[in-house]
UniProtKB/Swiss-Prot annotation:
InterPro entries: NADH_UbQ_OxRdtase_su1/FPO, NADH_UbQ_OxRdtase_su1_CS. The keyword Coiled coil does not apply. It holds the Pfam family NADHdh. GO terms for cellular component: chloroplast thylakoid membrane. It comes from Aethionema cordifolium. Its main location: plastid. GO terms for molecular function: NADH dehydrogenase activity; oxidoreductase activity, acting on NAD(P)H, quinone or similar compound as acceptor; quinone binding. It comes from the Eukaryota. Its EC number is 7.1.1.-. Belongs to the complex I subunit 1 family. It catalyses: a plastoquinone + NADH + (n+1) H(+)(in) = a plastoquinol + NAD(+) + n H(+)(out); a plastoquinone + NADPH + (n+1) H(+)(in) = a plastoquinol + NADP(+) + n H(+)(out). GO terms for biological process: aerobic respiration; photosynthesis, light reaction. This is NAD(P)H-quinone oxidoreductase subunit 1, chloroplastic. NDH is composed of at least 16 different subunits, 5 of which are encoded in the nucleus.
């Protein structure tokens, strides 16, 4: 069989075209993940700057102002400083657990962002069980904190790790029961379906009005999961120095610092998605679906802006709560979770189930 030169060139060009298609496929596959990571990093930097500015205003002081315009680059400067600091390891601790703990906490929180719909058709992974996936992934983070406390070979670190695990278990159950109530109202476990179910009746169709008790319980439980005041028992400075972070320095300490803000941001995003209508505008005579049908790019941009606006509104509430309420004792924290929030969330679930079964 004789192959002419033109046929060889055709075969070579076809091979190059197929290789280019594979490269383009890889690029388009990683582009959404890269965009999400860039967006998360930017969101955390803005969140840190907002907390410092709001905290400064509450305490009647100036706050950061030298690193960039209005001090907006102060968080980036702190991150670079921690990046070049020495990583110390406890001489008698378990170095494996000590090193894995921070990474496990950060990775488990980052994976939770994959099920967040930032706008219509703008979600990294639209699973049918997206809510359960978030609960399962978020349950891994306390394991990393417990590993960090145990691997540090320090009594304060170990007590902080135990407190983090106990606190997470105590408030994970009421939070899950609230999510089940939302899924019953929406007839779905998908975050996208939950947002679309709230878009039928506009502003009054938000789950905030249909589940006010569940919203309050979810708000309290999410603050406890984020270990924010008044629930910052695992790292109480007056009692445990810095809790499970006591022996950490450098980039590992920075990972814990980032993890706390990542957790706060993901909790606020879930409040927006589950209770505040997600990307829906909820204004009279303006429909989100009409915007997407007219101009998909403009509609997606507006949806992202609305989602982030609702998210940062909730973050403002979380930040002001930090400087308003006093820290609870450990026994008060556990009693509040097991004896108060759990029965109320269970009753709310039973009431929601009754309404759905009898179509009241």
């Amino acid at each position: 069989m004789i192959i002419f030169a033109t046929e060889v060139q055709t075969i070579n060009s076809f091979v190059r075209l197929e290789s280019f298609k594979e490269v383009y496929g890889l690029i388009w596959g990683f582009l959404p993940i890269f965009s999400l990571v860039v967006g998360i990093v930017t969101g955390v930097l803005v969140l840190v700057w907002l907390e410092r500015e709001i905290s400064a205003r509450i305490q009647q002081r100036i706050g950061p102002e030298y690193a960039g315009a209005l001090g907006i680059l102060q968080a980036l400067a702190d991150g670079i400083k921690l990046l070049f600091k020495e990583n110390l390891r406890p001489s008698r601790g378990n170095t494996t657990l000590f090193s894995i703990g921070p990474s496990l906490a950060v990775i488990s929180i980052l994976l939770s962002y994959s099920v967040i719909p930032f706008s219509n058709h703008l979600v990294l992974a639209d699973f049918n069980i997206g809510i359960f996936l978030w609960i399962a992934i978020s349950s891994i983070a306390p394991i990393g904190l417990l590993m960090s406390g145990y691997g540090s070979n320090n009594k304060y670190s170990f007590l902080g790790g135990l407190r983090a695990a106990a606190q997470s278990i105590s408030y994970e159950i009421p939070l899950t029961l609230c999510l089940l109530s939302i899924s019953l109202l929406s007839n779905s476990l998908s975050t996208v379906d939950i947002v679309e179910a709230q878009s039928k009746y506009g502003f009054w169709g938000w789950n905030l009005w249909r589940q006010p008790i569940g919203f309050i319980i979810f708000l309290i439980s999410s603050l406890a999961e984020c270990e924010r005041l008044p629930f910052d028992l695992p790292e109480a400075e007056e009692e445990l120095v810095a809790g499970y972070q006591t022996e950490y320095s450098g980039i590992k300490f920075g990972l814990f610092y980032v993890a706390s803000y990542l957790n706060l941001l993901i909790s606020s995003l879930f409040v927006t998605v589950l209770y505040l209508g997600g990307w829906n505008i909820s204004l009279p005579y303006i429909s989100s679906l009409e915007l997407f049908e007219r101009d998909p790019i403009f509609g997606t941009t507006i949806g992202i802006f609305i989602t982030l606006a609702k998210t940062y509104l909730f973050l403002f509430i979380s930040i002001t709560t930090r400087w308003t309420l006093l820290r609870l004792r450990m026994d008060q924290l556990l009693n509040f979770g097991w004896k108060f929030l759990l029965p109320i969330s269970l009753g709310n679930l039973l009431l929601t189930t009754s309404f759905q079964v009898f179509s009241l």
